[in-house]
């Protein structure tokens, strides 16, 4: 009886551990893949400390930054008035559907439909510190 209880406990713990690992993997993005996806973003955005803005603002340090806050960049009135602080959730939503999150912004990009690619991009942006 005790042996059966130990076996059941071990199986239950193994199942919980496997579920926790799977949930963690789904919840986060892969920064290395995100860096690869960023090549599309790099057409308009720089990503290095001190690099000049391009058509879009430099995204170095974007996580935690207030939207429309880089001095000297010509933001749309909509972006300036948005009041957004770029958290992980806000970045995910914006990358997926920019015009839905900030209607009237100037970014000429429809968004990324693949949720995993969005997660990967945000994971990469989080490394830019």
Where are these regions (language model features)?
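Bacterial N-terminal signal peptides that target proteins for export
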Residues: 1-12
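Periplasmic/extracellular electron-transfer cofactor-ligation site
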Residues: 29-74, 80-85, 97-103, 127-129
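Intrinsically disordered and other compositionally biased segments
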Residues: 8-10, 27, 51
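N-terminal signal peptide c-region/cleavage motif recognized by signal peptidases
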Residues: 20-24
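Generic cytosolic/nucleocytoplasmic N-terminal low-complexity/intrinsically disordered segments
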Residues: 5, 32-34, 89
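C-terminal capping alpha-helices of c-type cytochrome domains
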Residues: 85-129
């Amino acid at each position: 009886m005790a042996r059966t209880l130990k076996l059941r406990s071990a199986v239950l713990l193994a199942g919980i551990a496997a579920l926790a690992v799977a949930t963690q993997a789904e919840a986060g993005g892969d920064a290395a893949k995100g860096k690869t996806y960023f090549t599309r973003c790099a057409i308009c955005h720089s990503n290095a400390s001190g690099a000049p803005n391009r058509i879009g603002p430099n995204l170095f340090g974007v996580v935690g930054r207030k939207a429309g806050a880089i001095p000297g960049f010509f933001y749309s009135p909509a972006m300036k008035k948005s009041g957004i602080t770029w958290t992980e959730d806000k970045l995910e939503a914006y990358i997926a559907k920019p015009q839905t999150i900030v209607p009237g912004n100037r970014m000429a990009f429809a968004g990324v439909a693949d949720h995993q690619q969005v997660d990967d991009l945000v994971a990469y942006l989080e490394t830019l510190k």
